[in-house]
Each structure stands twice: as structure tokens, then as C-alpha cells.
Amino acid sequence: MPEPAKSAPAPKKGSKKAVTKTQKKGDKKRKKSRKESYSIYVYKVLKQVHPDTGISSKAMGIMNSFVNDIFERIAGEASRLAHYNKRSTITSREIQTAVRSLLPGELAKHAVSEGTKAVTKYTSSK
């Protein structure tokens, strides 16, 4: 019975570089498709909060799944809110309301204040 193919080890500390595969002579080199992830951003936040702490690739994978899950929940809720109010555009207001409804108490307050700060910084830089 043939053994299942083993996958390549996960890249360390949020690297997103393209990896090239080498094949037989005469064949062209084929680049691996880029895997998008939030790992570089998770790593940056980790270093802001705990500069001397590292993170394993397994833990980084869990954090990436978590961020993707929260993103999908917020986007879905914001989409529903826009639809209920007969709007075709998701604005920062829909995102803010979605965050308030999805996240509990103090966490929602912090998320809203950080989001407002980010939007203000973005609009002032334009």
C-alpha cells in the first residue's frame, strides 16, 4: 500500500516567499503558489506585546485560522446588516455594528476603539 505524500514543513515566523520546486533535467522549474496568511501581522503584534516571546508554526496556524474565522463572521454579519437596511455598500458603520454584536462586552469596546483609531489614521494619511 503506497504511503500518503508528506507535505513540506510550514514556513517559519510568517514568511510568505515563493518556493521553487526542482524537477528532472529538461523540465521547467515550477513555482509553488503563494499561500496568503496573517502570520506576519500576528508576529508583529506578538512582538509589540511580548518582545521576548516566540511562536511555533502550529500555534501560528491556529492564530491564522482564528483570524480568518473572525474575519468571515464580521464580514457575514456586516453583509446581512447592509442587506437588511437595503444598502449595497458595507461601510465602517456596518463593520462596527457587526463587531459590537459578535464580540462580548469589553472586547467589543476595545475592538471598536482600535478600529476607529485605524480608520482615522487611514483617512488622515490620504
From Swiss-Prot:
Recorded superkingdom: Eukaryota
Glycyl lysine isopeptide (Lys-Gly) (interchain with G-Cter in ubiquitin), cross-linked positions: 121
Keyword Ubl conjugation: yes
PROSITE patterns: HISTONE_H2B
Bias (Basic residues) ranges: 13-34
SUPFAM superfamilies, per database record: Histone-fold
Pfam families: Histone
Gene Ontology terms for molecular function: DNA binding; protein heterodimerization activity; structural constituent of chromatin
Subcellular location: Nucleus; Chromosome
Alphabetized UniProt keyword annotations: Acetylation, Chromosome, DNA-binding, Isopeptide bond, Nucleosome core, Nucleus, Phosphoprotein, Ubl conjugation
Main localization category: nucleus
Biased composition (Low complexity): 1-12
PTM annotation (N6-acetyllysine): residues: 6, 13, 16, 21
Post-translational modification note: Monoubiquitination of Lys-121 by the RNF20/40 complex gives a specific tag for epigenetic transcriptional activation and is also prerequisite for histone H3 'Lys-4' and 'Lys-79' methylation. Phosphorylated on Ser-15 during apoptosis; which facilitates apoptotic chromatin condensation.
Residues found modified as Phosphoserine: 15
Residue numbers spanned by region Disordered: 1-36
Keyword Transport: no
Annotated GO CC locations: nucleosome; nucleus
Membership in a protein family: Belongs to the histone H2B family.
Subunit structure: The nucleosome is a histone octamer containing two molecules each of H2A, H2B, H3 and H4 assembled in one H3-H4 heterotetramer and two H2A-H2B heterodimers. The octamer wraps approximately 147 bp of DNA.
Protein role: Core component of nucleosome. Nucleosomes wrap and compact DNA into chromatin, limiting DNA accessibility to the cellular machineries which require DNA as a template. Histones thereby play a central role in transcription regulation, DNA repair, DNA replication and chromosomal stability. DNA accessibility is regulated via a complex set of post-translational modifications of histones, also called histone code, and nucleosome remodeling.
PANTHER family: HISTONE H2B
Protein name: Histone H2B
Gene source species: Cairina moschata (Muscovy duck)
The organism's taxonomic lineage, starting at the top: Eukaryota, Metazoa, Chordata, Craniata, Vertebrata
